[in-house]
C-alpha cells in the first residue's frame, strides 16, 4: 500500500499573513481564523505547500497528486467549538476561533482512487462544511480522521 500524506503549514501560513500584513492570534495553540485568514490558509496549504510536497515526491521518482480535504468531498467539516475553563472563577467561556474546524465525516473514495492508480495522495487539511464554508483543520486531527476512515 502507498502512503497517504497529510500536511500542515503553520509557519508558511504565518509568513504569508505577515507579508500581507494580516494580524493573527492564537488561543491554546490554535490560530484564530477570520474571513481574511481562511483565504490565506487555503491558498498556502492547498497551493504552495501542497505543491512543494508533490514536487519533492515526484523528484524522488514516485507519482503523487495534491488535493485538499474539499476535493471529492474528502473532509466534511464542522466548526470547532472550544470552551475555556477558568479555574479561578469556575466559569466556562466559549471561545470563537472563527473558521477553525474539525472533521465531521471522511469520504476516502478519492484517496482509494488515487492509490488504485499508484499515486500518493498529498492532502491539505482544509475541509468544507455543509454550509459551504471552508474550515482550517489541524493536520494531526485530519490525519487521524483520515486514517480511521481508511481503517489504516
Please place each PLM-identified region on the residue numbering.
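Nucleotide/pyrophosphate-binding catalytic subdomain
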Residues: 1-152
Amino acid at each position: 500500500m502507498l502512503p497517504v500524506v497529510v500536511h500542515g503549514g503553520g509557519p508558511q501560513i504565518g509568513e504569508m499573513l505577515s507579508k500581507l500584513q494580516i494580524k493573527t492570534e492564537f488561543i491554546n495553540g490554535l490560530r484564530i481564523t477570520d474571513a481574511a485568514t481562511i483565504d490565506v490558509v487555503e491558498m498556502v496549504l492547498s497551493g504552495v505547500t501542497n505543491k512543494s510536497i508533490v514536487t519533492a515526491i515526484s523528484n524522488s521518482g514516485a507519482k503523487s497528486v495534491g488535493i485538499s480535504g474539499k476535493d471529492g468531498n474528502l473532509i466534511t467539516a464542522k466548526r470547532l467549538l472550544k470552551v475555556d475553563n477558568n479555574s479561578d472563577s469556575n466559569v466556562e467561556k466559549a471561545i470563537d476561533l472563527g473558521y477553525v474546524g474539525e472533521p465531521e465525516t471522511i469520504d476516502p473514495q478519492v484517496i482509494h482512487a488515487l492509490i488504485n492508480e499508484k499515486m500518493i495522495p498529498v492532502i491539505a487539511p482544509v475541509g468544507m462544511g455543509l454550509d459551504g464554508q471552508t474550515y482550517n483543520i489541524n493536520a494531526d486531527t485530519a490525519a487521524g480522521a483520515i486514517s480511521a476512515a481508511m481503517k489504516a
